[in-house]
Regions:
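Noncatalytic alpha-helical scaffold of FAD-dependent oxidoreductases
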Residues: 1-235
Length: 235
């Protein structure tokens, strides 16, 4: 990338102005020309929500000021965008070979350089949103013991990929990201498409702990039979 932005937030008692990125203005564009900005606490925490990071740029007209003023309350924001994506899913499937890639990859800090060398060489899709995250010191009981030993780090680097086209005939980037994340001892969000087989899935997630929780909380199997079946989507 030819442009890097580091966003640091700190509390102040007073502000000379307060920016609003829920309507006309667009946060991810503002970072190109603003070195300093003031937002309320809630607006800072949800500063990417209006655009779903920058997904609105993939929808014709949705970054135009007039359309945002007229229909912003119905179209903008992650909840609205998800609602419309579900409504239009049959049409989108006819127009696209596969859905665009929208997922988060959590890479151990000591493996991030390896991951980024691969990313800069192959996908090369930007913007790439990066956020450091701390793992609980006591460990995370839903990660398999062996995979936790592979992670072997208190810090994970969240790499968020939003709106990456995935129409190549011979390469499914969703599947490729999943494989590379596992190769770098990381984790991926499971609200996206999932491709791993059951054996690989439970190399990552702690099957006995999930099974125990399932038996206690859903003893009659009213919901999906197990975590793998709930999250796995071969399509």
């Amino acid at each position: 990338p030819d442009h890097l932005t580091l966003c640091l937030g700190e509390y102040v008692a007073r502000a000379p102005y307060v920016s609003d990125y829920r309507h006309d203005d667009i946060f991810y564009k503002s970072t190109r020309h603003r070195a300093l900005d003031y937002l309320g606490i809630e607006d800072y925490l949800f500063r990417y929500d209006t655009e779903c990071h920058w997904l609105t740029r993939t929808i014709p007209g949705l970054e135009h000021p007039l359309l945002r003023r007229l229909l912003g309350d119905r179209l903008l924001g992650s909840i609205n965008l998800q609602r419309w994506s579900r409504r239009l899913a049959p049409l989108i499937r006819q127009l696209q070979r596969r859905p665009d890639v929208n997922l988060d990859l959590l890479i151990p800090d000591h493996r991030f350089a390896d991951f980024h060398r691969w990313y800069a060489r192959e996908p090369r899709f930007y913007p790439l949103w990066i956020l450091p995250m701390c793992l609980p010191r006591a460990g995370y009981p839903w990660i398999a013991d062996e995979h936790a030993r592979r992670i072997d780090d208190d810090l994970l680097i969240d790499c968020a990929i939003r709106g990456m086209p995935n129409d190549e005939v011979d390469r499914d980037w969703s599947e490729r990201f999943e494989a590379q994340t596992f190769a770098c001892d990381g984790l991926k969000t499971r609200c996206a498409r999932n491709h791993d087989i059951r054996q690989r899935f439970f190399q990552i997630y702690h099957q006995p702990n999930y099974t125990t929780a399932k038996q206690r909380l859903d003893p009659h199997g009213l919901f999906h039979r197990d975590l793998f079946e709930r999250l796995h989507d071969p399509n």
